[in-house]
């Protein structure tokens, strides 16, 4: 992992703070989630939601989306300048589900964005509380990562659909700041850069003039973010080449795709945070919990504790399996879409199955779905153990590459081997090592070839009992070395469509 010299911890990024000590970080993260909770309670009052309706995850998501839309400056400005039929740029809303005479009903609500902003600021001591907004974006992003596949997006940019484990955070909006950049996977950054380069190839003026200068700054910043995720000198050197290119074109796209592939074995460091739905924070605040005083961390025991004591409900379609719906939301809550299923199952204390075996669709209900047949059930979001979230890719002993099955990006800091099919990955690297990046490419391939699937990552790290809040007694699980690792195996999920 890169030295902590200039880096801020995720929580500092999350709360926009400068360097703080652990207690200050815990307090400011606590203030952030407490503000989300207070906002949620106020919205439930405004909408006259019953206790049960306020615990419905679909209602939580609608309320979260409303506040994100109310603060989306860029889109608001765009909507005002390009009035479209039937869209009031000053209003935001969505479906709210209510229980009436033993049935669920959908009600579409509309609110003034100004009013939503007022309620949000009031819940956050009069501040804009951008950190809280980013936190909600990351929760939505983690939910998308667990729910949808990005095959189409990968293929469009010339990447291999099997690289899905690199796509964490691919649906995060551009405005998600440093906290958002920290949770983006290598593939996500590569895809953003490739899109940018392609626009430059097709549009001669993209890099020119005053606008072009801004574009260039954005390009270099994205390159630096991606460079910071790589852990080997050769990968970083290659990123320098891509960043310094005079006018980026197909050579850079090639280099980026090469780097993305290499990240399947030489994994990048990608942050993981447990971001929970707003209703969970609301429940805790309503029960009198003082987040700011108690302090809170997104990467420790706190989210597990919170989920242990929260009852959240979800609408269930006629042929969906409530246990599977629970698994989906559990994975989203812990940002574990790309984690090894053996590790997730052990921590959760229940078997976590690959997505192809889930009988459940996404959490959100489309406006044309029939409410007559909708039921609701409790989401089982509790866990048997807790573990610390990681921001490293789990590469063994410092700089050496370690194994990485074609789809694992570790979430939990727990000892395991990272099973992978070297033949499958290496097949993508035949030939092309000429050109200006040849020596780096050769070096990267050499490191990948020396990686062994039996090497152990996160040596000595274990899970903890939920009573062990100070993390004193690690329980190191032993996993069979079989390739049971990938959530995306035999995948049949829907595509993510904006």
Swiss-Prot record:
Main subcellular localisation: virion
Motif Unconventional nuclear localization signal in this chain: 1-18
Disulphide-bridged cysteine pairs: none
Keyword Signal in annotation: no
Any GO molecular function: structural molecule activity
Cellular compartments annotated: Virion; Host nucleus
GO biological process, one term: viral penetration into host nucleus
Motif (Bipartite nuclear localization signal): 198-216
PTM remark: Late in virus-infected cells, may be cleaved from a 56-kDa protein to a 53-kDa protein by a cellular caspase. This cleavage might be a marker for the onset of apoptosis in infected cells or have a specific function in virus host interaction.
Cross-referenced Pfam families: Flu_NP (PF00506)
InterPro entries per the UniProt record, alphabetical: Flu_NP
Keywords: Capsid protein, Helical capsid protein, Host nucleus, Host-virus interaction, Ribonucleoprotein, RNA-binding, Viral nucleoprotein, Viral penetration into host nucleus, Virion, Virus entry into host cell
GO cellular component, one term: ribonucleoprotein complex
Subunit structure: Homomultimerizes to form the nucleocapsid. May bind host exportin-1/XPO1. Binds to viral genomic RNA. Protein-RNA contacts are mediated by a combination of electrostatic interactions between positively charged residues and the phosphate backbone and planar interactions between aromatic side chains and bases.
Family recorded in the similarity comment: Belongs to the influenza viruses nucleoprotein family.
Entry function: Encapsidates the negative strand viral RNA, protecting it from nucleases. The encapsidated genomic RNA is termed the ribonucleoprotein (RNP) and serves as template for transcription and replication. The RNP needs to be localized in the host nucleus to start an infectious cycle, but is too large to diffuse through the nuclear pore complex. NP comprises at least 2 nuclear localization signals that are responsible for the active RNP import into the nucleus through cellular importin alpha/beta pathway.
Name assigned to this protein: Nucleoprotein
Species the sequence originates in: Influenza A virus (strain A/Duck/Beijing/1/1978 H3N6)
Name of the encoding gene: NP
